[in-house]
Amino acid sequence: YLWRGFDLGDGDAAVYGDLKVKHGSGAYAGIWGSSGDATLGTEYDLYAGWGGKVGALDVDASLWTYVYPDAGKGNIGAGDLVDAVISVGAGPANVTLYEALEGDDANEYRYVTAKYTKDKYSAMYGQHMYDEGASPGHIQLGYQYNDNLGFAVSQFVVDNDTVDDNPQFLVNYTLPLTK
């Protein structure tokens, strides 16, 4: 489970999926779940937002709450951890801001990505930003073989003993329920 460059699954594979409902206006809501957080256990996220065109820009704004129901591993409920996510893109380029609104890092942590996609290839830079400093960044390179199978490698670009700076390799296989 690779989250913003960090391996939350301690190298173990994770199963994840989501169910999303969309409206013609661009509004959407959904639930995302994963088996893969080695520290906090099973995770599910509730989200709602809006995505669409604003002039020539692709814009998406959403709120996410992260839930870890395993009582013995933290019992973090809906609303305990909340991020606002704003994404703006034009053509193959996209910038996304994740702002912590609730939780231990509320109003003290943000994460920003800049991504460029060309055909089946992508390059992304992600930067963690903490108010007190110590902000690791990472690069992720991806290749989307087809609609279902993708590969990526992620590498932190920081000389810091607090992050694992070994490259992380990701294989992603998707089984869509609809087309």
Cite the ranges covered by each PLM segment.
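Outer-membrane beta-barrel proteins
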Residues: Y1-K179
